[in-house]
Structures are given as structure tokens and as C-alpha cells.
């Protein structure tokens, strides 16, 4: 309690009076903490910002307290003081003074709160109880949906359940964010610089791509970045992304998580064995292997089993919520992840937005960026390109060629396109050469990096040919 004298309880809404509800279970709340927040604000208007960062009107359990807090917000926005007189007058104008307990209850709030010193702690209690009530409400909503699915199948019900629970978590996370003082940010920045200084001076500050020239351009795949890899069919975007995953799995301590929405896990593993063993993938796929092939594959399998540093989820039609929950689970189990890869973005779905593809892709893109930021892990997402580029003389992709490009281009920190001239020109002088075109890099240069493409091994390698213009 904020003071020694107990508060009189104001007029409450139906949920407070219903004897059936009272006889079963009362949702978690703290009337005392709510009263102390409201009373503290009348004592010290300067604490409004501290409280408003922690709670909103809907976080208060009783309707009178929600009305009082809302009216305090109006007074604050208008530049008026928040005290007993101004608050009572404002509530009277809204026709709500009697419903909140009248002038007498407001006077009690002010009188029985001796200090605003602990108002932030009281606000945290109010917020905490509100989150638990939200969880209870969502649990009831999920149960109701289970009893009355209204034509939805179990997958759709699971998506509803996960999305509603995630919404609570996301709202909570947003409340925990906000402006930080420059000394906090500076301390974290200096700590990061010191960490980088202690590392080998190879210019790689993120996850090593395994490609020297690409590392020079990007300094590696940076934590919290959303990285888009895009190409037209047959350019090798899945191969390139898998090579990034293989290199990360070999070089990093934490595991790599792959969501393969298009290709079964067995096919992914065949490609990986071909790449790491340098055995023709056609021979692996058909089983036409000689003793040397088997020896190479066995050696690769031994390394993979020893490191056990990769997870593959080949579920189709995943939602952002499903991707996020599965990534979180692996993250918790291993204390982190080195890389997340999704093949490919347009195969994900958001059932509630299925009627509007543009909004659906925007939500998928936004959620993947949020995942990268939350887990502090680079997220590599493959994307399709529009067919319209096939009509151009120069078929090298640009950012506007991304299918449903607006939101993807906006959310991405790094966009890489793959272009192989031999796909379009049989007699090209650039046979076996791939261009990795960096179309966007939020914190670095754009340009082109060349790699050698060894399709028979499902592999891109460092380019060792003549110098080239990388601008």
C-alpha cells in the first residue's frame, strides 16, 4: 500500500461485481499499485513520462482507473497541470466524474499517496499484471476457437494461437525499448569496438562468408541484419545460400538454422555432401559412385557428425510466427545461432493477409527483420525476381526487380543478386563465373564481386581469375 489509510473502492465495472466471476477466479491485478500510480501523478506531474513509457490506459484493471489515467493524459497533452481540481473538472466535462467515484475518491487518491518516489515500480506492477491478464484472455480466445473453429483447420488454429501469444510478447518488448542515454549507447559501442579490436585483423566483423572478396565488401554477414539473396531461376541462389550456411557451420561455434520451404531435407543434404566433398551431385543423386567418391563423402559425413552444427526444417508454407518460435527454440537450446537461412521468402504465408499479397509480403519481410534484430543473428532470405528483367538487353538485376520489392528493399540491410552471363549467352566469355551484385548495403559499399561457379559440385568458390572492376 502507498499509505497507511485504506482506499475506498470506487464504482467498478461488471467484471468486478459479477459474483460468478468472483466465485471462480479473479484476474491478477493490484488495486493498490494502480491507486499509487494515479495518486503519484497528481503529486508530481513531472513523473508522467516515466509512467507513460511503462503503461497505457488499458493496463489498468478497473474502468474508473482507466478513465482517470486517460483524462490525465489529456491534461498532460494540453499543458494543463494534473491535480485534484483540474482532474475533477476535466472528468466532469466528460460526464465521468461520478462513475470514477466522484471528487471524494480523487481526493483519497491524492491524500493517501504520500510520495511519488516509487511510482515507476508501481507502474511496473500494473504493467506486469496487465500482461498476465492478456495471456489469460488469449488463452480463453484460443480455447473458444478450438471449441468453435468456424471452418478453420488445426494448422490455422495453431497459427492463430501462436500469433496472438506472439503479439503479447511483441507488445511487451516494445514497452521495454525506447530512448537510451548517449552514455549507455557509447558504453556499448566502445565495448563492441574493443571486442572487434581483440579479433584477428582480417576485416571480418560478422559471420565469415567463406569468400575473400565478398568479405572485403561486407566485412561478413552482420548480426541483426536481414540479408536478401535474389536471382532468376537457374542462377544458383539456393546453392549460394547453402554455401554461406556450410561455411558458417564449419567456421562458427553456434549452429546454423535452415528453413527449406521448397526442397526436402534429403535433397538439401545431397547438395551439401556434393559441395563439401566435391563430388558430382548427379552421381550422388543417382548412386553411381566409385570408391574415391565414397571416401570423400565418408570424410565429409564424419566432419558434419562431429560438428553437429546445423538444423534443417523442411516444413512447407511456414508463417512468420512459426519461423520465429522454431528459431527461438533452437536459439535457447544452444545459447545462440550463427545464421538463419530461409529458402525462399515468397513461400512463407500469413493466413490473415492471404487476400492481399503486397501486405502479406510486407508482413513477412518485417517479421524476418524483427527476428534478426531480436536474436542478434543474420537472417538470409532468398527472394524471387520479376520476369520483366528478361525483356532488358542487360539482364543484371537491380533492386526494383525484386518481386513485391517495396517492403523487401526497405527492410533489407544487404541485398545480393546473383548473375551468370552464361545462362543467357551460351558462348559467353564469362563461363563458370558468377557475379554477386550488391544492390544495397546499409552500412557499406555497393558493387560487384566475382565467384567461380562449379555447378557439378553445387558450389561457388573464390574467384582466382584476372582483375575486374568491382564498382
From Swiss-Prot:
Pfam families recorded: DnaB, DnaB_C
Q: Name the positions where ATP binds.
A: 231-238
* Family matches, as Gene3D superfamilies: DNAb Helicase, Chain A, P-loop containing nucleotide triphosphate hydrolases
Q: Name one GO biological process term.
A: DNA replication
Annotated region (Disordered), positions in chain? 1-22
Keywords attached to this entry: ATP-binding, DNA replication, DNA-binding, Helicase, Hydrolase, Isomerase, Nucleotide-binding, Primosome
Q: Record's InterPro entries?
A: AAA+_ATPase, DNA_heli_DnaB-like_N_sf, DNA_helicase_DnaB, DNA_helicase_DnaB-like_C, DNA_helicase_DnaB-like_N, DNA_helicase_N/primase_C, P-loop_NTPase
What are the SF4 helicase domain coordinates in residue numbering? 200-467
Q: Quick one: a GO cellular component term? A: primosome complex
User: Reaction catalysed by this chain?
Assistant: Couples ATP hydrolysis with the unwinding of duplex DNA at the replication fork by translocating in the 5'-3' direction. This creates two antiparallel DNA single strands (ssDNA). The leading ssDNA polymer is the template for DNA polymerase III holoenzyme which synthesizes a continuous strand; ATP + H2O = ADP + phosphate + H(+)
In terms of NCBIfam families, this protein maps to: DnaB, PRK05748.1, PRK08006.1, PRK08840.1
- Family label: Belongs to the helicase family. DnaB subfamily.
Per its record, how is this protein called by name?
Replicative DNA helicase DnaB
Amino acid at each position: 500500500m502507498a499509505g497507511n489509510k485504506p482506499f475506498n473502492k470506487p464504482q467498478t465495472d461488471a467484471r468486478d461485481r459479477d459474483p460468478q466471476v468472483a466465485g471462480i477466479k479473479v484476474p491478477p491485478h493490484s488495486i493498490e499499485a494502480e491507486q499509487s500510480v494515479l495518486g503519484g501523478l497528481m503529486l508530481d506531474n513531472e513523473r508522467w513520462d516515466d509512467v507513460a513509457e511503462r503503461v497505457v490506459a488499458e493496463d489498468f484493471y478497473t474502468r474508473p482507473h482507466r478513465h482517470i489515467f486517460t483524462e490525465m493524459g489529456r491534461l498532460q497533452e494540453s499543458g494543463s497541470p494534473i491535480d485534484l481540481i483540474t482532474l475533477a473538472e476535466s472528468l466532469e466535462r466528460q460526464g465521468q466524474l461520478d462513475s470514477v467515484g466522484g471528487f471524494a475518491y480523487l481526493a483519497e487518491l491524492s491524500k493517501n499517496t504520500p510520495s511519488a518516489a516509487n511510482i515507476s515500480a508501481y507502474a511496473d506492477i500494473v504493467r506486469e499484471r496487465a500482461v498476465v491478464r492478456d495471456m489469460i484472455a488469449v488463452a480463453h480466445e484460443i480455447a473458444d476457437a478450438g471449441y468453435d473453429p468456424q471452418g478453420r483447420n488445426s494448422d490455422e488454429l495453431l497459427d492463430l494461437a501462436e500469433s496472438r501469444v506472439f503479439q503479447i510478447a511483441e507488445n511487451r518488448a516494445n514497452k521495454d525499448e525506447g530512448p537510451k542515454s548517449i552514455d549507455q549507447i557509447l558504453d556499448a559501442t566502445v565495448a563492441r569496438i574493443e571486442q572487434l579490436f581483440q579479433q584477428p585483423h582480417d576485416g571480418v566483423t560478422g559471420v565469415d562468408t567463406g569468400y575473400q572478396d565478398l568479405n572485403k565488401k561486407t566485412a561478413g554477414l552482420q548480426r541483426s541484419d536481414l540479408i536478401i539473396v535474389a536471382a532468376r531461376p537457374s542462377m544458383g541462389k539456393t546453392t549460394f545460400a547453402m554455401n554461406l550456411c556450410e561455411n558458417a557451420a564449419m567456421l562458427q561455434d553456434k549452429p546454423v538454422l535452415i528453413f527449406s520451404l521448397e526442397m526436402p531435407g534429403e535433397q538439401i543434404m545431397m547438395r551439401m555432401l556434393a559441395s563439401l566433398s566435391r563430388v558430382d551431385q548427379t552421381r550422388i543423386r543417382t548412386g553411381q559412385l566409385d570408391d574415391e567418391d565414397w571416401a570423400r563423402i565418408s570424410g565429409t559425413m564424419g566432419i558434419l557428425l562431429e560438428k553437429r552444427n546445423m538444423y534443417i526444417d523442411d516444413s512447407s508454407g511456414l508463417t512468420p510466427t512459426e519461423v520465429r518460435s522454431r528459431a527461438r527454440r533452437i536459439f535457447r537450446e544452444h545459447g545462440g545461432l550463427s545464421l538463419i537461412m530461409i529458402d525462399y521468402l515468397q513461400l512463407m504465408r500469413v493466413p490473415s493477409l492471404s487476400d492481399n499479397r503486397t501486405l502479406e509480403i510486407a508482413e513477412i519481410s518485417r517479421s524476418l527483420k524483427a527476428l534478426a534484430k531480436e536474436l542478434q543473428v543474420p537472417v538470409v532470405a532468398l527472394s524471387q525476381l520479376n520476369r520483366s528483367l528478361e525483356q532488358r538487353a542487360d539482364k543484371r538485376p537491380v533492386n526494383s526487380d525484386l518481386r513485391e520489392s517495396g517492403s523487401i528493399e526497405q527492410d533489407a540491410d544487404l541485398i545480393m543478386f546473383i548473375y551468370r552471363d552464361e545462362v543467357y549467352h551460351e558462348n559467353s566469355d564469362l563461363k563458370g563465373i558468377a557475379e554477386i551484385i550488391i544492390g544495397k548495403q546499409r552500412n557499406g559499399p555497393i558493387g560487384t564481386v566475382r565467384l567461380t561457379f562449379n555447378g557439378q559440385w553445387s558450389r561457388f568458390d573464390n574467384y582466382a581469375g584476372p582483375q575486374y572492376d568491382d564498382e
